[in-house]
């Protein structure tokens, strides 16, 4: 004997088994296993956590950067891995004076680095030429005349703590970038290429200013002054005959 279910029983069964379809929600269990992010954030996080610098040290500023490699400062915690090849580096740290003769080599290294790449100008000599540019015709007065610079680190020389501060600021810049907008915000000014022939200028400090009329008038009063007694030392005879006689007397 078969029993036919009532209409109310069928409706109750349908309501219990076939609930309304709603929007999926992220539960607490799912949020502990899945990280929701964007492609830009993931890409920037990977790049700022593994900066591979190419060390280009030409003067005393590089000694301060070499101090970071030791255990006292431990720059490995920032993910910095020094590379000896520009094709494996994404950060160029220029530390020291850049001369006209080394300028083509610096530009060649920059051109061989893959995109995206960054440059830190470390020290006063790198940024403005420093004290060497005052009386030198071969010192480049600012590395930004050769290649684009992302971050300037002044000092003579900068302390290792200042280098860490520069790396942290560069990491913030990398973290705020976007792949789609990088072309729009990229530096568009041209820099010197390798075959560029840099023009040499005549030296400025040649000593010719001493022969000017104003300098002659300023030096004339001191020309006739008597020499101090301490400077009037008797002349010493260094002939072989005098040396042999002094040896015989001793």
From Swiss-Prot:
Compositionally biased region (Polar residues): 240-250
Subcellular location, record wording: Cellular thylakoid membrane
Classification via InterPro entries: NADH_UbQ_OxRdtase-like_20kDa (IPR006137), NADH_UQ_OxRdtase_20Kd_su (IPR006138)
Single annotated GO MF: quinone binding
GO biological process, one term: electron transport coupled proton transport
Binding site for [4Fe-4S] cluster: 60-61, 125, 156
Reaction catalysis annotation: a plastoquinone + NADH + (n+1) H(+)(in) = a plastoquinol + NAD(+) + n H(+)(out); a plastoquinone + NADPH + (n+1) H(+)(in) = a plastoquinol + NADP(+) + n H(+)(out)
UniProt keyword Ribonucleoprotein present: no
Listed EC numbers: 7.1.1.-
Example of a GO cellular component annotation carried by this entry: respiratory chain complex I
Region of interest: Disordered: 230-250
UniProt keywords, alphabetically: 4Fe-4S, Iron, Iron-sulfur, Membrane, Metal-binding, NAD, NADP, Plastoquinone, Quinone, Thylakoid, Translocase, Transport
Enzyme class: translocase
Function, in words: NDH-1 shuttles electrons from an unknown electron donor, via FMN and iron-sulfur (Fe-S) centers, to quinones in the respiratory and/or the photosynthetic chain. The immediate electron acceptor for the enzyme in this species is believed to be plastoquinone. Couples the redox reaction to proton translocation, and thus conserves the redox energy in a proton gradient. Cyanobacterial NDH-1 also plays a role in inorganic carbon-concentration.
PANTHER family: NADH DEHYDROGENASE (PTHR11995), NADH DEHYDROGENASE [UBIQUINONE] IRON-SULFUR PROTEIN 7, MITOCHONDRIAL (PTHR11995:SF14)
Subunit (UniProt): NDH-1 can be composed of about 15 different subunits; different subcomplexes with different compositions have been identified which probably have different functions.
Family per similarity comment: Belongs to the complex I 20 kDa subunit family.
Name of this chain's protein: NAD(P)H-quinone oxidoreductase subunit K
